[in-house]
Amino acid sequence: MYLVVTRSFPPELGGMQNLMWGLTNSISKYNLTKVFADYQEKHKEIDDSVSFSIERIGGAKLIRKYRKAYLVNEFIKKNKKIECIIADHWKSLELIKSKKKKICLIH
């Protein structure tokens, strides 16, 4: 299983959002994939059309950061088959407590 932790994911528009979307779509064709992404308006249409699981985290930016890290850390504890954690930025990995292999796309 691959875990994607990102602040940049559709339906929000942008280059990093497109990169994370394309990367996640490609990975999900070969591996079970779970995404933790920031809440975006009108996300339901996209989330319902993909073959991987997307968990959206909302709230104020500072609270969202800690809440997302907590949810990711809990998910990692419960799922021992995670092979790799992929993040869009070092800030997305900052509070993740795991010795699993990590890939960070710094932009």
Residue positions per predicted region:
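N-terminal strand-loop element at the rim of the active site
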Residues: 6-13, 20-64
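A short helix->loop->beta-strand "cap" motif at the edges of active sites that frequently abuts
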Residues: 82, 99-102
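Short, well-structured alpha-helical segments in soluble
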Residues: 70-81
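Short His-centered aromatic/hydrophobic patch
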Residues: 87-92, 106
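Extreme N-terminal starter segment of soluble prokaryotic enzymes
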Residues: 1-3
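Short glycine-rich, flexible loops that bind phosphorylated cofactors or substrates
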Residues: 63, 93-94
